[in-house]
Amino acid sequence: MNTNKIGVLLANLGTPDEPTTPAVKRYLKQFLSDPRVIDLPKFKWQFILNYMILPKRSPKVAKLYREIWTEQGSPLLAISRQQQQALQDYFNRQNQNVLVELGMSYGNPSIESATDRLIKAGVSKIIVLPLYPQYSSTTTASVLDAFARGLTQQRNIVPFEFIHSYHNDPLYIQALANTIRLADDEKLLFSFHGIPKRYQTEGDFYPEHCQKTAQLVADKLSLSNEQWLVTYQSRFGDEEWLQPYTDETLEKLPSQGVKKIAVICAGFSADCLETLEEIAEENKENFLNAGGQSYRYIPALNANTDHINALAKLIEAKI
């Protein structure tokens, strides 16, 4: 063990290995089998998942992935690799003995394999950074579960720090604000990934984090309350999710006099299917068809310099 080497585990959701129906089916099965994501009784849910949902959804989702797939593969994985390399370069420039690895909750590279690589490299401490600014049991807690599984075969558990959230971090807020330039009469919509409403009532304070992030960015931009709003996207199933829903809101706004909209997905650290297809394409079409005149998607922070610096400072505070 190198007593001076620090390991950093960047963690995100994950992606299929390729945009094919079998690969997407494997990915969705792993993702939707996580009780942190779907907490229905296991036997009942597995029957529904395997015999009703996966056969129907896998081909449709694979088609959507093919539309955004790049030469580097999945946008989420490609951008996450860029983030990993940019952070590694940052610590190298600072002459800090830090090794940055990337792991995904679902798919490859797994969090368990990334944890194993860090331990085999002889790190004396691991800093786990889930790339979810707003805490949720459905995302952040799943990272902790996977990290713990990665430690199960280790005789000696190295000390670790777990970054719970950074929804109100000043550098993260500034990085978001730096990407936003509103035109005249343009309204700003913060679209966060939704969770079932029931999860909030059971103690998940994700929506409070989302509201706080949006408020801080709006304050940084000196926006009035009439210039921005928060909605929630990507709902799944019949259960009520956090509202207002992004898609329904965008379809109603033109009739309410909002003709120009800018949409930012502040909870996504990297662009992915939910931003590139659902928000940048599908919801744009819906808004314009409903009478909107201008729709602008503001890309995720991805590997831009402000974002990397914000993440680096979060990590440095734990070294």
UniProtKB/Swiss-Prot annotation:
Q: Which residues bind Fe cation?
A: H193, E274
- Which pathway does this polypeptide act in? Porphyrin-containing compound metabolism; protoheme biosynthesis; protoheme from protoporphyrin-IX: step 1/1
Q: Which keywords does this Swiss-Prot/TrEMBL entry list? A: Cytoplasm, Heme biosynthesis, Iron, Lyase, Metal-binding, Porphyrin biosynthesis
Where can this protein be found?
A: Cytoplasm
Which cellular components does GO assign to this protein? cytoplasm
Enzyme nomenclature, EC number? 4.98.1.1
A GO molecular function annotation here is: ferrochelatase activity
The top EC class, named as a word, is: lyase
Cited Pfam families = Ferrochelatase (PF00762)
What is the catalytic activity of this protein? heme b + 2 H(+) = protoporphyrin IX + Fe(2+)
Q: Which family does it belong to?
A: Belongs to the ferrochelatase family.
Output the PANTHER family linked to this UniProt entry. FERROCHELATASE, FERROCHELATASE, MITOCHONDRIAL
Q: What does this protein do?
A: Catalyzes the ferrous insertion into protoporphyrin IX.
User: What name goes with this protein?
Assistant: Ferrochelatase
Q: Which organism is it from?
A: Actinobacillus pleuropneumoniae serotype 5b (strain L20)
